[in-house]
Curated annotation (Swiss-Prot):
This is Large ribosomal subunit protein uL16c. The lineage of its organism: Eukaryota, Viridiplantae, Streptophyta, Embryophyta, Tracheophyta. It comes from the Eukaryota. Pfam families: Ribosomal_L16 (PF00252). NCBIfam families: rplP_bact. It is found in: Plastid, Chloroplast. Keywords: Chloroplast, Plastid, Ribonucleoprotein, Ribosomal protein. It comes from Solanum lycopersicum. GO terms for biological process: mitochondrial translation. Belongs to the universal ribosomal protein uL16 family. GO terms for cellular component: chloroplast; mitochondrial large ribosomal subunit. PANTHER family: 50S/60S RIBOSOMAL PROTEIN L16 (PTHR12220), LARGE RIBOSOMAL SUBUNIT PROTEIN UL16M (PTHR12220:SF13). HAMAP family: Ribosomal_uL16.
Amino acid sequence: MLSPKRTRFRKQHRGRMKGISYRGNRISFGKYALQALEPAWITSRQIEAGRRAMTRNARRGGKIWVRIFPDKPVTLRPAETRMGSGKGSPEYWVAVVKPGRILYEMGGVTENIARRAISLAASKMPIRTQFIIS
């Protein structure tokens, strides 16, 4: 699973997802890509599941680029804990994704193979996505 090696602070505010993605919204490595259409937090497990689905489907052909990285810690409190006594401990990492953001890219394969592999990755995502060609 992806996570930062080290961060400046252990815990972060939740923040809010406004507007569209102005960065990371163009295809820059491969020829085909999966683009987010909704805002969401995508966990490192979901990113990994999508990547695995793509690599298994494409077999040895082509190359895959993961364009998002989970750099935001999500804290959870233990079950049946009373309110107060501080913020919970970091449990997992998420990537903050806004509409327009490229999630995965693929190159070196035919369009129908890429379409099939990317649709498998899209089914692992918690949001609506679209397949785009550069």
